[in-house]
C-alpha cells in the first residue's frame, strides 16, 4: 500500500528532501528528469544529479518522454565492491517479484580478475537473487557507460539500477561522471540506491 503527499516548501530541493527523509516521511524519491539546458540529449539536470548523489533513500529518475512499460528486463551493473544485503536490494527484489522480471548483473572491467572481496560479494549477490530470474554477464575492456550502452543494443532493458557507493571523494566524482554520461543517452528509468541504507 502506498501513500503520496504534496508538499510546498520554501527551501532548496535537496535540503527539503534531506529534511523529509530525516523525518521518516519517505522511502523512495521519484523524479521526472529534464535537463536544464533544454537540449534533449541532456537528460539529467543539475537537480536530478544532485538528488541522486546525496539522497539517503533510493531515487527513481524517469525520463520526461518515457511511456510506462513493465520492467521485465532489469540491468544492474556492479563492480562487486559493495557488501550486498537484503535491505540494500529490497527495491530490486520487490520490483522483480511484482513484475516477474529478470535481472542482468553486468560487470565491466579492463581484464583484471576479481579480488577475493569482489568474489565474496558476487557470491552473496547470487544468494540474494536465488529466488528470482537472473544472469551474470562480464565484459572486458569497456568502462561502465560503454558496457551499459552496448548491452542495451543486445537486450531490451526496461530499468537500469545503480548502487551509489560513495566511500571516497574519488568514487563520488566517478559516480557523478558515470551518472552524467549515462544520462546523456538514457531513455528508460534509472533507479539509484545508496550503498548505506
Regions found by a protein language model. Give the residues of each.
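Charged helix-capping and loop-helix junction motifs
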Residues: 44-47, 89-90, 119-122, 174-179
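Short, structured coil segments at secondary-structure junctions
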Residues: 47, 55, 99, 130-132, ...
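Intrinsically disordered or low-complexity boundary/linker segments at protein termini
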Residues: 28-33, 53-88, 184-197
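Redox- and metal-dependent alpha/beta enzyme cores, enriched for Fe-S-associated oxidoreductases
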Residues: 86-130
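Structural beta-alpha unit
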Residues: 1-29, 130-180, 184, 188, ...
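Hydrophobic alpha-helical segments and helix pairs
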Residues: 13, 17-63
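Short, well-ordered secondary-structure micro-motifs
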Residues: 42, 72, 87, 114-118, ...
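Residues at the starts of beta-strands that form the adenosine-phosphate
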Residues: 3, 72-73, 100-104
Amino acid at each position: 500500500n502506498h501513500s503520496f503527499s504534496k508538499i510546498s516548501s520554501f527551501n532548496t530541493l535537496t535540503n527539503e528532501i534531506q529534511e523529509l527523509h530525516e523525518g521518516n516521511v519517505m522511502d523512495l524519491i521519484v523524479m521526472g528528469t529534464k535537463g536544464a539546458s533544454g537540449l534533449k540529449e541532456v537528460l539529467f539536470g543539475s537537480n536530478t544529479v544532485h538528488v541522486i548523489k546525496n539522497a539517503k533513500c533510493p531515487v527513481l529518475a524517469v525520463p520526461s518522454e518515457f511511456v510506462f512499460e513493465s520492467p521485465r528486463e532489469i540491468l544492474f551493473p556492479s563492480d562487486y565492491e559493495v557488501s550486498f544485503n537484503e535491505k540494500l536490494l529490497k527495491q530490486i527484489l520487490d520490483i522483480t517479484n511484482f513484475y516477474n522480471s529478470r535481472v542482468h548483473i553486468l560487470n565491466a572491467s579492463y581484464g583484471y580478475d576479481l579480488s577475493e572481496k569482489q568474489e565474496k560479494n558476487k557470491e552473496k549477490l547470487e544468494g540474494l537473487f536465488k529466488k528470482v530470474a537472473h544472469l551474470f554477464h562480464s565484459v572486458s575492456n569497456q568502462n561502465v557507460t560503454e558496457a551499459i550502452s552496448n548491452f542495451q543494443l543486445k537486450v531490451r532493458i526496461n530499468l537500469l539500477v545503480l548502487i551509489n557507493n560513495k566511500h571516497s571523494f574519488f568514487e563520488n566524482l566517478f559516480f557523478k561522471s558515470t551518472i552524467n554520461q549515462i544520462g546523456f543517452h538514457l531513455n528508460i528509468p534509472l533507479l539509484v540506491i545508496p550503498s548505506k541504507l
